[in-house]
């Protein structure tokens, strides 16, 4: 059952690509160089060989931090990274080799943040750190959409009390029903009103890419934003987190109108409000460099949402 859940079939991109050109110190093209990309979290390696034009491409990489190694006859081994690869992103990482013995290594760790120069797509990617650090109302990922340029909502509080025709952002002047929500490439839109049909725990998300314009043809069905959410996966190391968000009426300020209700004592004038939200994540390896799993749980006011995200790691060299 675990192995069956690990394989996801999707028409929407939930991975990234690393590409670039290999040259020597003079700028001349160097073909037939072996390029290896290593995922820092899972230690999974993906390899490719630069073609006659010195160009290499490593597609379908799970999001995360990567280091690339370049090895060619007559040149020192070159190591670049780590650097991030985001969902649906093409990272250009050119490699410059230095003449010398293969046993020698040139390591470059101060890598500039990759710029998105391969597409004209507009939008923004929210990392897991930014998502967990933000004071999102109700810990609802839809609230984060309001941080994206071009997104507005006349009633921001409605994201947690969504009824028909509410609870989402208006993006680039389009109606709120024109947004498209994807989770690991799977459509999670509410079939009745196109709201988000399933809201994962913020702590379960690796990153959220909000595309607002010039998206590729694979992301159809939306004139507004495409919200492409990617779940975390396990890694070779065991890791986890716990959280508890607490609010009640003792933490809220009183309102002008509540103060006018003199029939009630002062401590009863404010509307009763209590909110407890707690949960956590736990992930780690099942088999080192081969299989891992991540478990998450969130409870809000007695309603429990659980998510299991097993992941099969690709064999080294594939």
Name each model feature, range by range:
Residues 30, 190, 302-304:
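Conserved protein kinase catalytic core
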Residues 66, 241-247:
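Short, small-residue-rich packing micro-motifs
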Residues 51, 75-233, 248, 252, ...:
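Periplasmic N-terminal accessory/gating domains of Gram-negative outer-membrane beta-barrel systems
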Residues 2-127:
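Periplasm-facing N-terminal accessory domains of Gram-negative outer-membrane beta-barrel systems
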Residues 180-182, 244, 293-294:
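Structural recognition of the beta-strand scaffold that forms the well-ordered cores
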Residues 234, 239, 269-318:
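Transmembrane beta-barrel wall of Gram-negative outer-membrane proteins
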């Amino acid at each position: 059952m675990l192995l069956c859940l690990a394989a996801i079939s999707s028409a929407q991109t939930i991975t990234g690509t690393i590409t670039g050109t290999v040259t020597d110190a003079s700028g001349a093209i160097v073909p037939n160089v072996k390029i290896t990309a290593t995922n820092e979290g899972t230690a999974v390696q993906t390899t490719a060989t630069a073609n006659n034009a010195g160009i290499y491409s490593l597609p379908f990489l799970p999001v995360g931090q990567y280091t690339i190694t370049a090895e060619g006859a007559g040149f020192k081994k070159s190591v670049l990274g780590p650097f991030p690869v985001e969902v649906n992103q093409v990272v250009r990482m050119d490699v410059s080799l230095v003449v010398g013995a293969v046993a020698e290594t040139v390591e470059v760790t101060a890598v500039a943040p990759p710029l998105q120069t391969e597409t004209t797509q507009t939008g923004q990617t929210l990392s897991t750190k930014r998502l967990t650090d933000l004071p999102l109302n109700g810990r609802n990922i839809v609230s984060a959409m309001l941080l994206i340029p071009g997104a507005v909502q006349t009633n921001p509080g409605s994201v947690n009390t969504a009824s028909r025709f509410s609870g989402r952002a208006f993006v680039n002047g389009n109606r709120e029903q024109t947004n498209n929500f994807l989770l690991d490439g799977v459509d999670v839109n509410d079939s009745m009103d196109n709201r988000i049909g399933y809201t994962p725990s913020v702590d379960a998300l690796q990153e959220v890419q909000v595309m607002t314009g010039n998206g590729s043809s694979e992301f159809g069905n939306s004139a507004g934003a495409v919200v492409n959410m990617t779940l975390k996966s396990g890694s070779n190391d065991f890791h986890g987190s716990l959280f508890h968000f607490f609010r009640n009426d003792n933490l809220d300020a009183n309102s002008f109108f509540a103060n006018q209700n003199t029939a009630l004592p002062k401590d009863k004038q404010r509307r009763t409000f209590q909110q407890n939200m707690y949960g956590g994540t736990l992930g780690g390896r099942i088999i080192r460099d081969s299989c891992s799993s991540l478990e998450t749980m969130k409870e809000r006011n007695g309603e429990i949402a659980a998510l299991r995200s097993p992941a099969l790691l690709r064999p080294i060299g594939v």
